[in-house]
Amino acid sequence: MSVYAGIFNTTLNPQELNMKSFAGTILRRVPNGSAPLLAMTSVVGSTTAKASTHGYFSKTMVFASAVVTAEAAADATVLTVENSDGLTKGMIFYNEATGENMRLELVNGLNLTVKRQTGRISAAIIAANTKLIVIGTAFEEGSQRPTARSIQPVYVPNFTQIFRNAWALTDTARASYAEAGYSNITESRRDCMDFHATEQETAIFFGQAFMGTYNGQPLHTTQGIVDAVRQYAPDNVNAMPNPTAVTYDDVVDATIDAFKWSVNVGDNTQRVMFCDTVGMRTMQDIGRFFGEVTVTQRETSYGMVFTEWKFFKGRLIIKEHPLFSAIGISPGFAVVVDVPAVKLAYMDGRNAKVENYGQGGGENKSGATDYSYGHGVDAQGGSLTSEWALELLNPQGCAVITGLQKAKERVYLTAPAP
């Protein structure tokens, strides 16, 4: 112990004696973007999964046609085709090459008996590999009921995935006083919730279906959007031909197939494009290089922010998903999503199910019914459990794009001074 002579100042107290001055809660720093970190989790609908194997049935509209395998003369009435599935008596064929219409009168295996020149255009030679398009049916008055047709449903399987995260601290830590506004228990719980939410958001995009075992028990994971597109709509996976000079036409080519099919649950002219930071900048630059900007003297701000990208098939709502950049995906990544066609199918009672362990020191509430359990440990904690399967009803309405690294800059032509 010592005696100080002079004016007392703040450096003379032990550090522990000075009260700290700071904000009442801990600052939480998360990745930023025009979409929130939990963009998909916060907007998709939910439904119920009744088993760990969860799937759905889909039907894709079929437009009938027939491909002629051998040349047929102008007066030929029997045509041999590659496939006759779904063809029935009464259908009208249209030959785009010659303009002739003909009526199908009999299907015998791969041999079709037709009535030529069913219309104004005269019959002509039908070349091999000609595609005959079905443009409807035509029946006589008082006709018999036609052959029924139906589209066979396809089962699209997936599995549920169990997400678990926990929080825990010793009861001494629980009882210890912290700085004003800070709670050891609250912060531990909050960390648990953040991990639980972000892991599910990541799985929505990047999960893959798997069924196996671990510790003698079933272990299953769900298929995310990216893998579903790769499996069911591989033509919708596109890499930019020149990642450092991406053009408007490149983006059209990469997204057009996502508008080819629609389902009866949403807007068939709208999709959402989630980009990383680099991809978002590229989309902005494409718009910026696309037109002319006029600035007047009265303007006090400049610059442009594009939230939609339009072309002849529809429009894309452009969002920067902070998760893509945060987890380190290769720069220039984007996923086009038909959002109304995405749902999370939760198992009953397993949507962020809460369990608390050892409240008050670990030995109390052994018979409690409020999800609190003693476990004989001088600590307390808890867990969150969610189990769901991703239900993507329209993978053909989504797309995966890589290489959106830099927009092709505009070339300005300058004329020499007169």
Curated annotation (Swiss-Prot):
InterPro entries: SU10_MCP. Changing residue 327 to T: Escapes CBASS defense in P.aeruginosa strain Pa011. It is found in: Virion. Pfam families: SU10_MCP. Keywords: Capsid protein, Late protein, Virion. It comes from the Viruses. The keyword Hydrolase does not apply. GO terms for cellular component: viral capsid. The most highly expressed virion protein; probably the major capsid protein. Mutations in this protein confer resistance to host-encoded CBASS type II-A(GA) viral defense (in P.aeruginosa strain BWHPSA011 / Pa011); overexpression of this protein alone in the host does not activate CBASS. The above mutations are predicted to lie on protein-protein interfaces within or between monomers. Multimerizes. This is Major capsid protein. It comes from Pseudomonas phage PaMx41. The lineage of its organism: Viruses, Duplodnaviria, Heunggongvirae, Uroviricota, Caudoviricetes.
